[in-house]
Design a protein with these regions (language model features):
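A short, Trp-centered hydrophobic/proline-enriched beta-strand micro-motif
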Residues: 39-58
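Gly/Pro-enriched, hydrophobic low-complexity segments
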Residues: 123-204
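N-terminal signal peptide c-region/cleavage motif recognized by signal peptidases
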Residues: 24-26
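Sec-dependent signal peptide recognition
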Residues: 11-18
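Short hydrophobic/aromatic-rich beta-strand segments that constitute the beta-sheet cores
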Residues: 51, 73-77, 92-95, 143, ...
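N-terminal secretory signal peptides that target proteins for export/translocation
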Residues: 1-9
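Boundary at the C-terminal end of the N-terminal hydrophobic targeting segment
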Residues: 28-31
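An acidic-aromatic
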Residues: 62-114, 178-179
Length: 204
């Protein structure tokens, strides 16, 4: 898994969005919760949301997310320098407008592949899935792999009422964590193909 972090002066390193080392689980209740989470993703056609991202070093950023399942996601970071993350079924494109450059990575090497797949499987082959119940009706589903493609930990955090995704967290193999908390979520609104278009920079 790859992580996007803000340095000073502001600069986003590649590709992340997202947290938490979990311990303990309840196998029976956990299986039910995982199925409920998979059903939640299956029922999402489109989503728009604001987000706040916090990195391990305490740096923060805000922006907007547009998702059209399956496969399509755009994450736009506010502030300077501008940064956009845009997915296709195969690629994660990192658009840096200030440098007039797009860099592309296989989506399978990022945690985004797990939540953009059709269907979503939160117990994929080769991964360990652990469920943890937290205070206030919060449920965390951690999907972990020690090595190889997609190594690291993705944690999805759901509220109980309504049951929906509120935060995701990524921890890479070096232990660097990034969390993204969603706000002002809206579902089922039109999302056109143009929202996921890539710029045509010279010499690309």
């Amino acid at each position: 898994m790859t992580i996007v972090t803000r340095q000073k002066p502001p600069r986003w390193h590649l590709v992340t969005i997202i947290l938490l080392l979990l311990i303990g689980y309840s196998p029976v209740a956990g299986a039910d919760i995982v199925q409920q989470a998979e059903s939640w993703f299956a029922n999402v056609t489109t989503m728009r949301a604001d987000f706040t991202q916090i990195a391990s070093d305490g740096s923060a950023a805000e922006g907007k997310i547009v998702m059209r399942r399956p496969s399509r996601l755009k994450i736009t970071y506010d502030g300077v320098p501008a940064l956009n993350l845009i997915t296709t079924p195969v690629w994660l494109h990192v658009d840096q407008p200030d440098e007039r450059r797009v860099t592309s990575y296989p989506i399978s090497e990022t945690p985004l592949s797990l939540i953009l797949a059709d269907p979503v499987s939160l117990r994929p082959a080769g991964y360990e899935t652990i469920v943890k119940e937290r205070a206030g009706g919060i449920t965390q589903i951690a999907i972990h792999k020690d090595s190889g493609e997609g190594a690291g930990r993705l944690t999805l955090e759901f509220t109980a009422s309504p049951f929906q995704l509120r935060r995701w967290i990524v921890e890479d193999v070096a232990g660097i964590q990034t969390s993204v908390t969603l706000q002002n979520m809206a579902f089922g609104l039109p999302v056109e193909n143009a929202e996921f278009s890539l710029p045509n920079y010279p010499n690309q």
